[in-house]
Amino acid sequence: ADTPDELLVGTATGDDAAVWKIDDDRAIVSTADFITPVIDDARTWGRVAAANSVSDVYAMGGRPLFALNLVGWNTESLPTSLLGELLAGGQDVATAAGFAIVGGHTIDDPEPKYGMAVTGEVHPDRILTNAGLKPGQDLILTKPLGVGVITTAIKADVASAEVAAGAIESMTRLNDVGSRIAVAAGATGCTDVTGF
């Protein structure tokens, strides 16, 4: 099938989000992401999942506008009060990042999942992509690697409180500042490194 001219980033490069050109100054960034619980506290898991979801927009050099909650919930074994805490964690991130949660969808699922479909905007000439990376460029990490190993240790109850707190801080910290700095500095590429 022919690719529309408006599709600036699609599936060909394995990027974090799709980008669709609206006009010479605006393009829409669209992504969806969700995760299974990485921590026992529902509100913290909500914050982690929401920060993870919106990070895809930041990785493209964009700014989030709004999101839809995506929830898989075991209605037979998990109370709705816990779901409320989960969604409150997502709202915490939306408030901090300045985007609206405008709805969503919930399905009955034996394994709980939470995330968001996030829509944002980016200037068509300032999109950061995987394909934009060039040999010889410096690689800058905005967060430490290894959080997936730590979340596994948390689930096995072998991570110290200090290590767990550091991982949670990293997973819930927004990538908005790093994204703005990258765009302002003329970065040509970016990706969201996740490994839950």
Where are each of the predicted segments found?
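Helix-biased detector of long, well-ordered alpha-helical tracts
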Residues: 1-196
